């Protein structure tokens, strides 16, 4: 899980999800692409 000020999709499989006001990126193909804004 990377914590970044600006989250961007790294690959085509990355999805932007908003949970409890926190923007997250989840990726099925590569779990290393997981990110959280903060």
Swiss-Prot record:
InterPro entries: Ribosomal_bL36 (IPR000473), Ribosomal_bL36_sp (IPR035977)
Biological processes annotated in GO: translation
Domain of life assignment: Bacteria
GO MF term set: structural constituent of ribosome
Protein name in the entry: Large ribosomal subunit protein bL36
Key words, A-Z: Ribonucleoprotein, Ribosomal protein
UniProt similarity note: Belongs to the bacterial ribosomal protein bL36 family.
A cellular component annotation (GO) from this entry: ribosome
Cross-referenced PANTHER family: 50S RIBOSOMAL PROTEIN L36, CHLOROPLASTIC (PTHR42888), LARGE RIBOSOMAL SUBUNIT PROTEIN BL36C (PTHR42888:SF1)
Organism of origin: Myxococcus xanthus (strain DK1622)
Originating gene: rpmJ
UniProt KW Membrane keyword: no
The keyword Ribosomal protein is annotated on this UniProt entry: yes
């Amino acid at each position: 899980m990377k914590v970044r000020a600006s989250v961007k999709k790294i690959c085509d499989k990355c999805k932007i999800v908003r949970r409890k006001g926190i923007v997250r990126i989840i990726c099925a193909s590569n779990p290393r692409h997981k990110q959280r804004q903060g």
